């Protein structure tokens, strides 16, 4: 056996069927699509259901986007433990330390985790539980 005599295994190299290339191929003229009609022609658009009212039009429209919605940057209590006792925590300090990326419409402090430090926290909003936890730890809150 020589290198030029090597053959691929039988059935391992099947040629793809090229349609529309002459009648003797068995898939010429209509290219295996039959006669006329929608299926013999181009594609139907995405979401087309054969003339039936499509799903995206059967389902009612709902809700709206509130243009005056304010989105707050969230700070959890557990993140405030990184500061030393007696620190005055301001939005600028939070951004500087990488706790929040940007201020958005303001900063809101939420009561996720425990606070073990006595801090003066200045933010735009506080949840009730967060405010209580800061004051219980001996700190103070100030709404900006």
From Swiss-Prot:
Pfam families: Ribosomal_L27A
Native organism: Leuconostoc citreum (strain KM20)
PROSITE patterns to which the protein is assigned, alphabetical: RIBOSOMAL_L15
Positions of the UniProt region annotated as Disordered: 1-44
InterPro entries reported for this sequence: Ribosomal_uL15, Ribosomal_uL15/eL18, Ribosomal_uL15/eL18_sf, Ribosomal_uL15_bac-type, Ribosomal_uL15_CS
Compositionally biased residues, Gly residues: 23-35
This protein's name: Large ribosomal subunit protein uL15
SUPFAM superfamilies to which the protein is assigned, alphabetical: Ribosomal proteins L15p and L18e
Gene: rplO
One term under GO cellular component: cytosolic large ribosomal subunit
Entry superkingdom: Bacteria
GO biological process annotation, one example: translation
Keywords: Ribonucleoprotein, Ribosomal protein, RNA-binding, rRNA-binding
PANTHER family per UniProt: 50S RIBOSOMAL PROTEIN L15, LARGE RIBOSOMAL SUBUNIT PROTEIN UL15M
Function: Binds to the 23S rRNA.
Subunit (UniProt): Part of the 50S ribosomal subunit.
GO molecular function: rRNA binding; structural constituent of ribosome
Family of the protein in this entry: Belongs to the universal ribosomal protein uL15 family.
